UniProtKB/Swiss-Prot annotation:
Residues 162-193 are annotated as: 4 X 8 AA tandem repeats of S-S-T-N-K-P-E-A. It comes from Entamoeba histolytica (strain ATCC 30459 / HM-1:IMSS / ABRM). Residues 82-161 are annotated as: 6 X 12 AA tandem repeats of S-S-S-D-K-P-D-N-K-P-E-A. This is Serine-rich 25 kDa antigen protein. It is a peripheral membrane protein. Residues 193-219 have a biased composition (Low complexity). The keyword Cell membrane applies. The gene is SREHP. The keyword Lipoprotein applies. Sequence repeats lie at residues 82-93, 102-113, 114-125, 126-137, 138-149, 150-161, 162-169, 170-177, 178-185, 186-193. Residues 160-192 have a biased composition (Polar residues).
């Protein structure tokens, strides 16, 4: 186990060292130290390269200025030519075409549509349809149905059931049962029931005693089993 841990530590250390070497190469830290140790000849060459690079932007800036001047001159010529051509055509079109179209087409169409179509349709729908339907439904349907149901159905059914069914049942069934069944049962069944009930009571008391003894014997065993099950779970 210890050897396995040493192997893991060694492999992780080697991977970390390799990663550090790659990061150092990417950041060019070694190049900084080499520049400090470079000879003066290399420094002079670097200065000459910087001067040549600075001279190139100056020449490019002069060329850009010349190009800008040429573009400005060409744009001025184009503007003069466009100013000479455009003002001849525009006022004629604006003076001749626009007022005719505005005077002929627009005022003729709009008032006709507004005067003929809109005011005729709306009052008819409002005057004919809406007020006729609502009062009829309110006057005819609702008050007719409710009082009929309340006046006809409810008071008729309840007193009939109370007046017809209850006294008949009380008058017919009860005295017959009291007059026929009770004396016969009292005259015939009591001595036999007394002889049989004594034997049943004795057997029932003996069975109850047996059941009580079984319950008393089995109750500690049940409690012990319940404790064991509770400990297991």
């Amino acid at each position: 186990m210890f050897a396995f841990l040493l192997f893991i530590a060694f492999t992780s250390a080697t991977n970390i060292i390799l990663d550090l070497d790659q990061e150092v190469k990417d950041t060019n830290i070694y190049g900084v130290f080499l520049k400090n140790e470079a000879s003066p000849e290399k420094l002079e060459e670097a200065e000459e390269k910087e001067k040549s690079s600075s001279a190139k932007p100056e020449s490019s800036s002069n060329e850009d200025n010349e190009d800008d001047e040429d573009e400005k001159a060409s744009s001025s010529d184009n503007s003069e030519s466009s100013s000479s051509d455009k003002p001849d055509n525009k006022p004629e079109a604006s003076s001749s075409d626009k007022p005719e179209a505005s005077s002929s087409d627009k005022p003729d169409n709009k008032p006709e549509a507004s005067s003929s179509d809109k005011p005729d349709n709306k009052p008819e729908a409002s005057s004919s349809d809406k007020p006729d339907n609502k009062p009829e439904a309110s006057s005819s349907d609702k008050p007719d149905n409710k009082p009929e149901a309340s006046s006809s159905d409810k008071p008729d059914n309840k007193p009939e059931a109370s007046s017809t069914n209850k006294p008949e049942a009380s008058s017919t069934n009860k005295p017959e049962a009291s007059s026929t069944n009770k004396p016969e049962a009292s005259s015939t069944n009591k001595p036999e029931a007394s002889s049989t009930s004594n034997s049943n009571d004795k057997s029932g008391s003996s069975s109850d005693n047996d059941n009580n003894n079984l319950d008393a014997a089995s109750s500690p065993f049940i409690v012990f089993c319940a404790i064991i099950i509770a400990i297991i779970f």
